[in-house]
């Protein structure tokens, strides 16, 4: 039995149910049904095991975590265990009563997704009507309660020019931080890649907009920026390194090294109903497979950045090359690098196809009762 340093944070994907139908959704193609979700006792046990391991942060996500009626109980349990609690939400499924319960339970931070500052654009990408006003009202409710707020703004070819407006919105909504992140093409988002891929010119404009805002705003607003991998020369480290800093729990209780790991066919993922979290983290097949550097191909082994980017993203290597154990094709040392860049340029230059939604009818506003 081996022992790895404990993860810094655990992401609890409480449910895959969600009012939105975002074209860039990174959740798996096959979603967990309501009847498959882990029960309250299972999630409480997970939090206890995480705290015992030395985990510091618990991020409550989904789907939409506010559709779980036991969310306040789980947040309170995390607080009692000394875990920092963060809510990652769409902001359209929970109102003041739920937020009051979460604040009373000890919630410490809220991350709110914003699809666009243009109302029509926001509704189109989210597949949900009147989404932006609902998010604005939710943000006001969060700030009225004194909770710290981060805005998560996802970029693509249809909204890349509106980065200045997104930053202005974060200031108007009194957020402390905004994450301006280009779409990462995993899960359902990969199906819509051709509809979402920005041009290189759009990318450079977003970089300039972020740099300008950082200079002008100083410490008034923290701005994080994530570029699209397809135009990069160096890969990003997968979650800070596969199986090193982060652990993801699916609604079914499967323990994953990263959000998209289930796309890797043939890899076995242990479940909390059958095995303890610490044992899975230290010895589970999925975590050991790509942890560290021993698994790396020769080109990675000789790279001075091998313990910086850790070989890049395993799920992306699979998606773009068909082999999860090879170099991330984003890396300029990869034989497939030129093909990745060509794919991005070709798709960005072509007319954007229509979005493919999980629910093809582009749903009307949903309720918890309709989201099984």
From Swiss-Prot:
InterPro entries: 4Fe4S-binding_SPASM_dom, Aldolase_TIM, PQQ_synth_PqqE_bac, PqqE-like, Radical_SAM_PqqE_MftC-like, rSAM. GO terms for biological process: pyrroloquinoline quinone biosynthetic process. Its EC number is 1.21.98.4. Disulfide bonds: none annotated. Keywords: 4Fe-4S, Iron, Iron-sulfur, Metal-binding, Oxidoreductase, PQQ biosynthesis, S-adenosyl-L-methionine. Residues 342-372 are annotated as: Disordered. Binds 1 [4Fe-4S] cluster. The cluster is coordinated with 3 cysteines and an exchangeable S-adenosyl-L-methionine. Its cofactor is [4Fe-4S] cluster. One of its GO terms (molecular function) is S-adenosyl-L-methionine binding. It catalyses: [PQQ precursor protein] + S-adenosyl-L-methionine = E-Y cross-linked-[PQQ precursor protein] + 5'-deoxyadenosine + L-methionine + H(+). [4Fe-4S] cluster binds at residues 18, 22, 25. Pathway: Cofactor biosynthesis; pyrroloquinoline quinone biosynthesis. The keyword Iron-sulfur applies. It comes from the Bacteria. Residues 4-220 form the Radical SAM core domain. The keyword Oxidoreductase applies. Transmembrane segments: none annotated. It is an enzyme of class 1 (oxidoreductase). PROSITE patterns: RADICAL_SAM. Catalyzes the cross-linking of a glutamate residue and a tyrosine residue in the PqqA protein as part of the biosynthesis of pyrroloquinoline quinone (PQQ). Interacts with PqqD. The interaction is necessary for activity of PqqE. Belongs to the radical SAM superfamily. PqqE family. This is PqqA peptide cyclase. The gene is pqqE.
């Amino acid at each position: 039995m081996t022992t790895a340093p404990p993860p810094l944070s655990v992401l609890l994907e409480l449910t895959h149910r969600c009012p939105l139908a975002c074209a860039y959704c990174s959740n798996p193609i096959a979603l967990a049904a309501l009847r498959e979700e882990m029960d309250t006792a299972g999630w409480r046990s997970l939090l206890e095991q995480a705290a015992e391991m030395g985990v510091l942060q618990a991020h409550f996500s989904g789907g939409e975590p506010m559709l779980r009626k036991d969310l306040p109980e789980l947040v309170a349990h995390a607080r009692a265990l000394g875990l920092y609690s963060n809510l990652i939400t769409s902001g359209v499924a929970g109102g003041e009563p739920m937020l009051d319960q979460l604040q009373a339970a000890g919630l410490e931070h809220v991350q709110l997704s914003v699809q666009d500052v243009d109302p029509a654009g926001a509704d189109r990408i989210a597949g949900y009507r009147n989404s932006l006003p609902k998010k604005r009202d939710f943000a006001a409710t969060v700030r009225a309660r004194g909770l710290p707020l981060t805005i998560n703004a996802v970029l693509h070819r249809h909204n890349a020019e509106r980065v200045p407006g997104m930053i202005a919105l974060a200031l108007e909504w009194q957020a402390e931080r905004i994450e301006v992140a280009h779409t990462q093409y995993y899960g359902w988002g990969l199906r819509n890649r051709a509809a979402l891929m920005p041009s290189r010119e759009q990318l450079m404009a977003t970089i300039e907009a972020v740099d300008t805002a950082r200079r002008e705003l100083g410490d008034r607003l923290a701005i994080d920026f994530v570029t699209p991998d397809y135009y990069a020369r160096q890969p990003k480290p997968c979650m800070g390194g596969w199986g090193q800093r982060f652990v993801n729990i699916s609604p079914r209780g499967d323990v994953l090294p990263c959000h998209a790991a289930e796309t890797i066919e043939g890899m076995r993922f242990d479940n909390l109903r059958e095995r303890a979290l610490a044992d899975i983290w230290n010895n589970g097949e999925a975590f050991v497979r790509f942890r560290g550097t021993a698994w790396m191909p020769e080109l990675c082994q000789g790279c001075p950045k091998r313990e910086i980017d850790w070989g890049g993203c395993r799920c992306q290597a699979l998606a773009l090359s068909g082999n999860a154990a090879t170099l991330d094709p984003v890396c300029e040392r990869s034989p497939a690098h030129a093909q990745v860049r060509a794919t991005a340029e070709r798709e960005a230059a072509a007319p954007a196809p229509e979005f493919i939604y999980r629910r093809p009818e582009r749903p009307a506003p949903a309720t918890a009762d309709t989201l099984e």
